[in-house]
């Protein structure tokens, strides 16, 4: 399977970065063809300065990301949840990459996702307990329905570790979650 891993934390030394790398490494060992976009290290302006009415001066990175998305069968997003949403750099990636004509189009008043047939997984961390998002929805349901679902991508798996930087957050707590991520990558 062709897998694209998108690491969405702006911090190259973050736990989300570690999780994305663990998934990518394990998926390669399992025989998958893996590419990774590491937004913490990319030279990429995440600000959509003119909406979609005008192209920005440098479209090289978004065009490369679109090529990677078109290539992939499965996308894996790894990111922390901050203020009930993804980090700004990941939001900017979505804004500049999942553009009209590439990811979706409108036919009259109806939208059509153009990335149908692709699947995705979310690997997320949060300071809040995980059950809060299962109970109230929030960012996970938004990603499933209003981001991925809107462009035709089917969310097949969500791995979430809550209570990061809380009393239960120990090295063994995090290591157990890394192993869960590795097991998912193995299939």
Model-predicted regions and their roles:
Residues 134-187:
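Glycine-rich phosphate/pyrophosphate-binding loop and the adjoining helix
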Residues 18-21, 49-52, 90-93, 135-138, ...:
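Short, glycine/charged-enriched secondary-structure capping and boundary segments
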Residues 32-43, 159-162:
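A short beta-strand-loop structural module common to alpha/beta enzyme folds
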Residues 10-11, 41, 127-128:
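Short, glycine/serine-rich, charged loops/turns that create anion-binding
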Residues 61-144:
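Helix-loop-strand module that forms the ligand-binding subsite of alpha/beta enzymes
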Residues 53-71, 174-181:
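Glycine-rich, highly charged phosphate/nucleotide-binding loops
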Residues 39-57, 170:
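N-terminal beta-loop-helix "entrance" segment that forms/cooperates
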Residues 1-32, 37:
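N-terminal beta1-alpha1 ligand-phosphate binding loop
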């Amino acid at each position: 399977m062709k897998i694209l891993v998108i690491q969405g934390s702006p911090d190259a030394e973050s736990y989300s970065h570690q999780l994305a790398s663990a998934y990518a490494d394990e998926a390669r060992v399992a025989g998958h063809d893996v590419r990774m976009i590491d937004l913490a290290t990319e030279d990429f302006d995440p600000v959509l300065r003119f909406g979609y009415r005008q192209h920005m001066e440098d479209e090289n990175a978004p065009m490369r990301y679109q090529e990677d998305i078109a290539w992939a069968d499965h996308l894996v997003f790894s990111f922390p949840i901050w203020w009930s949403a993804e980090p700004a750099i990941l939001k900017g990636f979505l804004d500049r990459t999942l553009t009209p004509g590439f990811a979706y189009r409108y036919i009259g008043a109806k939208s059509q996702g153009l990335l149908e047939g692709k699947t995705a997984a979310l690997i997320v961390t949060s300071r809040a307990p995980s059950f809060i998002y299962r109970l109230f929805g929030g960012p996970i349901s938004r990603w499933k329905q209003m981001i991925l679902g809107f462009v035709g991508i089917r969310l097949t798996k969500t791995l979430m570790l809550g209570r990061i930087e809380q009393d239960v957050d120990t090295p063994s707590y995090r290591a157990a979650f890394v192993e869960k991520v590795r097991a998912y990558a193995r299939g």
